Amino acid sequence: VELCAERAFLKAIGGSCNAPAAGLAHLDENGVLQMDALFAPDQKHYRRVSGTLETGFDGDKGVCLGEELAEKLMQGKVWLVGAGPGNMDLVTQKCLRCIRQADVIIYDSLATDSLLNEARMDAELIYAGKRADHHHLRQWETNALLIEKAKEGKNVVRLKGGDPFIFGRGGEEAQELRAAGIEYEIVCGVSSCYGAPAYAGIPVTHRDHASSFHVITGHEGNHKSGTVLDYATLAKEEGTLVFLMGLKNLPSIASNLIANGKDPKTPAAVIQEGTTARQR
């Protein structure tokens, strides 16, 4: 059974001296087969996987486990990566590593396109281009593309400004990847919600003035019939209110806060292209 599983794995993976692969199976006294396997399709970066199956002494079941692990290893992986707020010095080391190793990079509108210069010469670059009221690819198309490229065995980077889980639709994409059985990893990025104010000299918390800060979308999805923001509660908050992507709706945001009791003299700032040389 062990031998059947190992041979099936190596056959399915196409293991050779050009693309190192290894599989080790162990059948315990209860008829449970445990197998560990690894594969280096690019001859440098090993992928590892393991699996367990109650096979008894049925060699065909061992074959099934070996082939299943091979399929998992030949499938690619997706990294949902935050590129930071725009200043290249604020890009994380892990973000750079992901970009440099990626087979495919699906990227949004970035504050600095020079980050893409870090990609391999043979990497496939696909623009998804999200800006207010204009998406080069619709979200479902982006989701499908991530899954498609990963199933081709590619290492895929989904590159977003800021942090992928702060109004970056990273959560939606992670859900779709999980449902499709695609391995993925979240790579946090510096968010403009605190990076941009910091570069403007504004602390979002301060012992004398703000014991909390609140990050709020300034651009609610078009699928909503109206705002779901509770301006009555927001207006009462002592902490700093940070509205992201709010330039277009700035008059509405300000008027809603004031209408719900926020002092019109409350200190406020509008920051564009924060942390970059174009900040204003």
Model-predicted segments: where are they?
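Small-molecule-sensing regulatory modules
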Residues: 1-76
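Electropositive phosphate-/nucleotide-binding environments in soluble metabolic enzymes
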Residues: 1-3, 7, 56-63, 67, ...
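Alpha-helical scaffold segments in soluble metabolic enzymes
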Residues: 8-12, 68, 72, 94, ...
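Solvent-exposed alpha-helices and their adjacent loops that cap or buttress functional pockets
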Residues: 15, 27, 75, 97-98, ...
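Glycine-rich anion-binding loop/nest that anchors nucleotide
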Residues: 17-21, 82, 109, 242-249, ...
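Beta-strand->loop->alpha-helix junctions that form or flank phosphate-binding loops
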Residues: 22-28, 52-53, 126-129, 188, ...
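Class I S-adenosyl-L-methionine
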Residues: 77-88, 93-190, 195
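Beta-strand/loop-alpha-helix module characteristic of Rossmann-like adenine-cofactor folds
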Residues: 175, 183-185, 191-280
